[in-house]
């Protein structure tokens, strides 16, 4: 499998940002894979997630790009100034959609977003904010309420990064609703150790999508399924097989 590690200067963040790329630029689908909370661009590779996707990468079905994160300065910095934190988060959002994504974008095609834990939070935010850019979302052990991280603080940017707040207020005939209904949306969460908050967060979004008539797949795994890499390593290829079936050679 082709892999490369790169860095680029982000005008949005005024700093260098690193990322990993796995697979060929001619692959059918681009997938942005976000790291877990406070994680780095190499985590998806180092914890074996890229390896579980090798059959799809090698078959030319998928190219995975792993951005770097700044959660420690934004979502996780609960003692920091909330306005500064969410404004910095918005600058990171623009780094992803305006700087990182365009060189990899396929002509006439949209990308996929995925992630586990905080990566699943990011996947949800990018997908629901920009269904004009993304038409597949796989969130493993994510949640979708910005106030989980910002508590009593709310402004227009926290709202924009909180699908459980803005989706209920979106009119049924909003143009984004049509794009959501044309997309593939997968939510997955375990019911075991350390998944309690994520389970509630998945239920919350599941109910909103159902009420809005947005097709989706909410998959609740067993009570032995914990918030851990060993389970995400099982979930990722399981869902890739549903999204990108690989034909088996007969005989």
Language-model segments: which ranges?
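Non-catalytic cap/lid and distal C-terminal segments of serine-dependent acyl enzymes
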Residues: 1-251
């Amino acid at each position: 499998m082709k892999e490369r590690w790169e860095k680029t200067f982000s005008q949005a963040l005024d700093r260098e940002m690193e990322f990993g790329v796995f697979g060929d630029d001619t692959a059918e689908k681009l997938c942005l894979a976000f790291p877990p909370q406070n994680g780095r661009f190499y985590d998806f590779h180092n914890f074996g997630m890229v390896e579980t996707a090798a059959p799809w990468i090698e078959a030319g079905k998928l190219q995975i790009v792993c951005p770097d994160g700044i959660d420690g300065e934004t979502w996780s910095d609960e003692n920091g100034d909330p306005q500064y934190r969410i404004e910095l988060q918005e600058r990171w959002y623009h780094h992803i959609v305006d700087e990182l994504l365009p060189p990899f974008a396929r002509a006439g095609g949209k990308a996929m977003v995925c992630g586990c834990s905080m990566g699943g939070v990011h996947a949800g935010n990018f997908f629901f904010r920009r269904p004009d850019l993304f038409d597949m979302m796989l969130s493993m052990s994510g949640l979708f309420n910005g106030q989980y991280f910002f508590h009593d603080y709310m402004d227009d940017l926290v709202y924009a990064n909180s699908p459980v707040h803005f989706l209920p207020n979106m009119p049924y005939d909003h143009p984004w609703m049509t794009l959501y209904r044309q997309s593939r949306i997968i939510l997955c969460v375990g019911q075991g150790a350390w998944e309690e908050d994520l389970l509630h967060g998945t239920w919350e979004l599941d109910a909103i999508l159902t009420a809005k008539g947005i097709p989706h797949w909410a998959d609740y795994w067993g009570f032995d399924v914990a918030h851990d890499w060993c389970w995400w390593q099982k979930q990722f290829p399981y869902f890739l097989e549903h999204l990108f079936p690989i034909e088996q050679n007969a005989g």
